[in-house]
Amino acid sequence: MPNTKPVGVAFSDPELVSGTTITGATISGGTISSATSVSASDITTTGGLYLKTATVAATGSTQADAASISDGLTLVSAADATKGVKLPAAVAGRTVIIKNGANAVLKVWPATGDGINAITVDSNYVLAANTSSLLIAYDATTWYSVPLLAS
């Protein structure tokens, strides 16, 4: 990592390049940003923790044609007891919050090969009208809802 800014006889502000690993560093008063992810064994924040949000219209009636959703909070419209949404692929710890904003039940499908609660792999569960559910991936194929919804 080259030193790029001269300060007296020393240099400061080393330039970090792609692939650089920093171990045991403390960031003070700065920002860490990434287009993909930042990981650590523990993350403490003195400010807020913000989730991304989206609004999606429910579509289709099967896992194959349901509207895809992502991490964070998704407000779902257009549920009519036949339409649904599809979760992203399960990755341990992945968190999704779904708010059914419609006056009808919403089908919630896992990604292909995944399961939700104790139901059969690739089967949906039903989210009641105007309710919410927090879903957390336990491993690479299993989602659990909080509260645990009957399946």
Which residue ranges define each predicted feature?
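Extracellular disulfide-bonded cysteine-rich modules/repeats
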Residues: 129-139
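Well-ordered beta-strand positions in beta-sheet-rich domains
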Residues: 84, 124-126, 133
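Residues that act as N-cap/strand-start positions at coil-to-secondary-structure junctions
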Residues: 37, 79-81, 92, 119, ...
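Intrinsic low-complexity, repeat-rich intrinsically disordered segments enriched
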Residues: 1-71, 103, 120-122
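Exposed extracellular interaction/assembly regions and N-terminal maturation sites
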Residues: 42-112, 141-151
